[in-house]
Amino acid sequence: KLIKAVINGQVARKKIDDTALRIVRTMLAFHNARLNDGRSYNETVIGCQDHRNLALKSAQEGITLLQNTDQILPFNRSIHKKLLVLGKLGINDNIGDYGSSRVYSAYNISVMDGLQALLPNHEITYYDGTDPQFAAFLSAQADAVIFVVGFDHDDEGEYVSPNQSSCYTAARGGDRIHGLGLHPDEVRLIQIAGPVNKASAVILIGG
């Protein structure tokens, strides 16, 4: 379309040249800055222990406790030995967008993975929460319940499929049709299974 617009005189060639110049100038500036930096980085630093420690620290300091009714948290390891993890994000490698910012890490640790590694002697059950009533049944049998809800790359994207251009908010990866709140099925899961077990906590993933 752009080439056609230039040929038809709708877009001036100078505008194209000016735009290209700005891009190339910026690329060269960063390239020269890297050459003059004096430091070099190779693949050995990718996923090194220092970087893993920093990632762990960032994750820990990025967690915010929004509410702790009846001081349920922290769970007591000697009392809460039978745990239930609810929600489709409980076993997902949910580490960000799948677009240009996607990161391909050597390994990922889901909430379920982390709990199993931290509490090897505890009984930990997972259910995706598809049936809230069954989730409530499982909740009644657990010592504590952890709901893992929130957003993944399909909710945070910017891409809207052309065949859904007339309904942007419903498009996968576009604006969320239900606004900025949790998905209705996750809200229903918490409302139905949550009250069954007083020792329930919700992990909200967003960002």
Spans of model-derived segments:
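C-terminal non-catalytic regions of proteins with extracellular/luminal or membrane-system context
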Residues: 1-13, 45-49, 53-207
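Long, well-ordered, tryptophan-enriched scaffold segments
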Residues: 2-35, 43
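Conserved beta-strand positions in repeat-built beta-propeller and related beta-rich domains
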Residues: 35-40, 75-76
